[in-house]
Curated annotation (Swiss-Prot):
GO molecular function: fructan beta-fructosidase activity; sucrose alpha-glucosidase activity
Gene Ontology terms describing biological process: polysaccharide catabolic process; sucrose catabolic process
Record organism: Aspergillus awamori
Protein name per the record: Extracellular exo-inulinase
Compartments, as annotated in UniProt: Secreted
Outcome (variant: G338A): Improves the enzyme thermostability while maintaining the specific activity
Length: 537
């Protein structure tokens, strides 16, 4: 569909052409959000035939959680998205829903191991959690209990536009493994991928309340064998869900390691309330994941956090990309207040897609993330603001105007005399409304302060300050890249080893910024601000 000016897009619905406007207050201009209604976890991320598919948890009937189906959008560059019809519509939607389609993943079955392919067409196979709100006998003849969660599959022969559920045998993994059968209400979120070394399909799924992951293998995506378990380890403050398992390059060389990601709700990073995502680095032999010793901590609260902010959850990885091109997307919201954020007619957006790799930092294999969009198509190389300061005195610099959507590159010396250095963003003219992003030199921490960021009235925990550890680089320099949209701030620190993601809801005229050094001088400061255009234009 050809994009139109003024953030209007033309869509066909039931034979009627209409225009949709992506210019509402708080509507992200370079983050994906559905035209309308509720969205949560990214699902079925698949790169196939030059197209990035983004499926997502979606309520086709309203702006709150319910009627959970799979929405669908596609892109050629992870930047400009086209929303497609609902891919998997809750069974019975419009009357009595008997099955919802909870989170899952998708693969291209290029060798047609499933037998779903016809006439030379490669089947795309989605694996998802069937949630049954009522006890029933299914078309396959299987019986399920009220509120049961089971793993099912569906396939597409038209590159993901329409899907057929495998009713003859669904669910293909009906129950949690022994001895955890009692956990049938908390068995969900399968992540499936092809393991080339063993020539098997592998799926990892969550036994949520027990903080365990169950790993299965299959030859055909239909018949599954339990091969191992993982957990509990590290943070266990809430349920484990939305797991992932991916191989990543280490130090840009020939060596690799495997990474498990797992959502946690509640019990997110220190200082947050609600959900978060942790990760483990280790080895995977096709059946068993063995974590590295330095990725596991004593107790049940310390973790390797994928993001230290409050609004990055249910991160999922793309199938179909090469080892060096791995990309994850996270849900940019939080279960603590997600149903109450002040947006309309949609609720929730996705975070910027992130390129993932591992680097040895402080002798430890560490996840590093970089923002992955077609930046040259939406941002100029020439900054709208560029300043350097050999020494920035205590106090604030003159105000500059940024607009609502922009990127900030900041660097400064870790040997500065200041206690903190920060930039105030999305600020009102008198700076009574502002979001602060900065660095605490003594604690060696990034911080993001949204206590005065705009509308914080919808949840008592929203107005808060968040921190993430960041050691200066080998030259003693601290580097931050900050991406600001109409209702979000995403901070990438250092090489991407520390990120913080937070929603904000500022006034539309809060378009000012300034630098501030507190408790002394900040040395060798460079600040560049780049305008980012709307992807909907």
């Amino acid at each position: 569909m050809a994009p139109l000016s003024k953030a209007l897009s033309v869509f066909m619905l039931m034979g009627i052409t209409y225009a949709f406007n992506y210019d509402q207050p708080y509507r992200g201009q370079y983050h994906f959000s559905p035209q309308k209604n509720w969205m949560n976890d990214p699902n079925g991320l698949l790169y196939h035939n030059g197209t990035y598919h983004l499926f997502f948890q979606y309520n086709p009937g309203g702006i709150e959680w319910g009627n959970i189906s799979w929405g669908h959008a596609i892109s050629e560059d992870l930047t400009h998205w086209e929303e497609k019809p609902v891919a998997l519509l809750a069974r019975g939607f419009g009357s009595d829903v008997t099955e919802m389609y909870f989170s899952g993943s998708a693969v291209a079955d290029v060798n047609n191991t499933s037998g779903f392919g016809k006439d030379g067409k490669t089947p795309l196979v989605a694996m998802y959690t069937s949630y049954y709100p009522v006890a029933q006998t299914l078309p396959s003849g299987q019986t399920v209990q009220e509120d049961q969660q089971s793993q099912s599959i569906a396939y597409s022969l038209d590159d993901g536009l329409t899907w057929t559920t495998y009713d003859a045998a669904n669910p293909v993994i009906p129950n949690p493994p022994s001895p955890y059968e009692a956990e049938y209400q908390n068995f969900r979120d399968p992540f499936v991928f092809w393991h080339d070394e063993s020539q098997k399909w592998v799926v990892v799924t969550s036994i949520a309340e027990l903080h365990k992951l169950a790993i299965y293998t299959s030859d055909n995506l239909k018949d599954w064998k339990l091969v191992s378990e993982f957990g509990p380890y590290n943070a266990q403050g809430g349920v484990w869900e939305c797991p992932g398992l991916v191989k990543l390059p280490l130090d840009s060389g020939n060596s690799t390691k495997w990474v498990i990601t797992s959502g946690l709700n509640p019990g997110g990073p220190p200082g947050t309330v609600g959900s978060g995502t942790q990760y483990f680095v280790g080895e995977f032999d096709g059946t068993t994941f063995t974590p590295d010793a330095d990725t596991v901590y004593p107790g049940n609260s310390t973790a390797n956090w994928m993001d230290w902010g409050p609004d990055f959850y249910a991160a999922a990885g793309y199938n179909g990309l090469s080892l060096n091109d791995h990309v994850h997307i996270g849900w940019m919201n939080n279960w603590q207040y997600g149903a109450n954020i002040p947006t309309y007619p949609w609720r929730s957006a996705m975070a910027i897609p992130r390129h993932m790799a591992l680097k040895t930092i402080g002798s430890k294999a560490t996840l590093v993330q970089q923002p992955q969009e077609a930046w040259s198509s939406i941002s100029n190389k020439r900054p709208i603001y560029s300043r350097t300061f050999k020494t920035l005195s205590e106090g604030s610099t003159n105000t500059t105007t940024t607009g609502e959507t922009f990127k900030v590159d900041l660097s400064f010396s870790a040997k500065s005399k200041a206690s903190t250095f920060a930039i105030a963003l999305r600020a009102s003219a008198n700076f009574t409304e502002q979001t602060l992003v900065g660095y605490d030199f003594a604690k060696q921490q990034i911080f993001l302060d949204r206590t005065h960021s705009g509308d914080v009235s919808f949840d008592e925990t929203f107005a808060s300050v968040y921190h993430g550890p960041l050691t200066p680089d080998s030259t003693g320099v601290v580097k931050l890249s900050i991406f600001v949209d109409r209702s979000s701030v995403e901070v990438f620190g250092g090489q991407g080893e520390t990120t913080l993601t937070a929603q904000i809801f500022p006034s539309s005229d809060a378009v000012h910024a300034r630098l501030a050094s507190t408790g002394g001088t900040t040395e060798d400061v460079r600040a560049d601000i780049y305008k980012i255009a709307s992807t909907w234009n």
